[in-house]
Amino acid sequence: MDGLKEITAAVASLGGTTDLSTYMVNFDLGDMMDQSAGVVIDDVHPPVEGASVDSAMDVDAESEDEKDEEPGTGRDEPEVESEADEDPDEVEDAIPAAVPSTIPLSTTIRGFGADLGLGKNLTPADLAGNGLGKYAATLFSKTLPTLAAVVEQKGAIDPGSSVAKSIVTLLSSELGNALGIFSRLPTREQNKMAAVMILMKVLGRTALPPLTKTDEGVLSAINLVFSGAKRKVLVSTHSDITKFIIFNDDGTIPTLGVDTVAPLMKYYDPRLKLTTLVLIKNLGNNGTVEVKRRSKGKTLVMRERIPVECFLFRAFPVTESSDNIYATLDFVKRLLKGVSTQSSYVYVKNPKSIGDDFLNTKNTSLTLGDAPLTVKLSFRKPTNATSQSGFKRWLLICKWLARGGRIELGPKSTLRSGHEEESLEEEVNTGCIRSMASLTRLASRAWSPKNILKVNDRPVMTPSILNEIPDFVHRGNTLPIWLLFAASLRLDIVAVKEWLSTEGGDPRSIDVAKLTYHQYLFLRLLSDAGIAKKGLSKLLTATNNWLITEMSFIVMYKGSYGVNPTVLSTISDNNVPNLPIFSWIGEIPLWSTSGIVEKVKIVHTNSSLVSRMMLLSDVTEVAKVHAIKAKVRAEQKASKESAKGEDAAKKAPKRKREAEAGTETPKKKQKEEKSEKPKKTGKAEKSTGTAKVTKKEKTEKKTPQTKSTNKKNVKSVSAEAGTAVTPDEANGKKKSTQVKKKESAGQHTTEKKKRTAAKKKTVDRPSGHRPSSKKEYRSQEFVSSDDSSDEEVISKPRVTTTENMKSTKKATLASNMDDDGDDDGFMTCAGQFDIGGGSGFLTSTAGRNRKSNKQSKTLLLS
């Protein structure tokens, strides 16, 4: 347990240096955060409190100044005199009538101590007589009832709550200091013992219920010790818990859960800060006994091994001399007599003689002490110890520690519909952890469910669990404690375990940029306390370029000017450059920050330094870098301009060649065609195109769908459909030519879009309602007499125009009209084609007859 105390001692000395690889030789994050103006790091103390089991709430965890005080006094003389000068009425008014939301322990207890400070003026006769009566009235009528209400309000009645038990421990420390003002007891240990006795007398029924009614560690330790013996274990406690047994702890009594099992053992509860003595009967008796049981209306007689019986009672181990012990008991007796309260106590000088006669008999009562000062303990009927849920609780914690602070959840519970509660209760009673729900249910009986976190579908405990772990669980090995703590802080426990172990090479590295401030403090404590023999630089690495630059700048700046750059706003010396840092971090949104980056952002937000600068290892390099960047920008701009000039030079000869050849670009020619077309012609085109599509659809309905069609069928069908084109020919040759020109321009789109459009039309429309453009009605009867004009239209280069692509009516025309001879398929009048497939493309005869292709396209364009 020395490592635990070293951690607590290391809290007060967080300063120092940490060597984080080569980038932070003297970089101190904690020191830098403390110096930042207006920055407050909240809740840094929970990891520190949880780091120690023995001293988290221990009454011995007082400051060194209090240890150096004179014996018999709890505080300095000036403080007592200043408090003693207060009006007693003001002290009474300071005590609230109702229970406050926050516990004013320092105000209430120290106010009580100030009132009792008048006891310094008591004469020896008053101390020898009943002079403590009025002070006992103040103690029991004003102070302790209020504190009892506070303890009760904080959940002390709940057996699973440890908050109130910690309050009792804190009260005993404060009350011990207050009693030291006038008790005239020579040592602080005597004053603490007197305070605990008084608190047990006043708060015992509320804060310290009988042992069998609460889930204490001693019961779990008993079950843990005898779990492999295959014997029933019975436990019992005495009825009156306000009877004080004081025994001389000379180290001869073994510790339960740590040492070998003996008839008399002791157990120290880290939560209650109280010691329990355990008397074990039938330990060496391996005989059997007949047991009658009822099953299905029948009485069965079975033989079982004689159960082990454990009788428990609280006691106070002391190492003082007999005179000091009797002086303390006498003081408590006279103080309680002032309020007409009797106390029963006994001092056992020789602890080896405890229970000698009791273990050899079947009596359920035990008499301790010598006449006339004797105490009789009457024990209850022994009950089955396995009914205590604490046994499962400590087994759970043992598994937790053995697996590095985590528990592998088993298969999911087979919860029956409508019986989830019964299934969970069954799992808890059997100690089976199959789901997060059963784990929470089991843990909630011993500690708050808020202490359970779920990280990556695995349960992890918060640091407050460290105050719940007794000594018999970790048995002095602190490594599982640190691993549990690391897991509760969501650290990589594998890396921490390798770092804490003295064997092996370098551990797995952790990126320092991903650490939170609490995680950094915890690792720093382990390093400063000497628990981690390997340096912190072996564990932490800096992989972010910004963090490396940041640390290098801070180390350089502090080494050059002796101050961190975060406090430059308070420096008036002109020789120190007033350069702001961390300004770049202000551009990062708060929702995307994490870990140390968030803390740095807080530093930036709270600082008065608003200018932007570059974080470099040397301040003089700023101007050089700006000049270099300006030069690079100029070169990039010049290169872009030269690239534009080259592109213009490449385009000029192309236009010149086109002018010499007498050709025009497709866009230019298309614009000319649009300008030549009258408006009425456009209307005629629309109406004609609509009529044409309608008539073709009507003809299409009459056409039977076959998988293959020969040339004769195509000609016959085309002959029937020939009448559908006669209204279009009646409009005149000029209009027909213009319609063909405009429609042909809309057909030259990219090949990919054509195929997609054709497939969509084929799938969306029923096969009987396909447009006639999808059918190969190719015949020379529909070819216009003016073949030369048709040849010009087909020979035009392909142009994709936005206007034609948006036209919904023209999109119903055939989409595969390329004249490049590829194997993708052409609309020819030769060979067979598949109508049922929906494509209407021919792949076997593609590109065979060039003249037929042109004629087919002319047909479709008409």
From Swiss-Prot:
Q: Where is the composition biased (Basic and acidic residues)?
A: 633-650, 657-686, 694-703, 761-779
Signal sequence coordinates: none
| Organism name | Ictalurid herpesvirus 1 (strain Auburn)
Name of the protein in question:
Uncharacterized protein ORF1
Q: What is the lineage of its organism?
A: Viruses, Duplodnaviria, Heunggongvirae, Peploviricota, Herviviricetes
Where do Basic residues bias regions lie? 751-760
Annotated GO MF terms: RNA binding
Cite the record's Acidic residues compositional bias ranges: 57-69, 78-91
Any one Gene Ontology biological process term? RNA splicing
Q: Name one GO cellular component term.
A: ASAP complex
Q: Where is this region: Disordered?
A: 45-91, 633-824, 837-862
Q: Which domain of life is it from?
A: Viruses
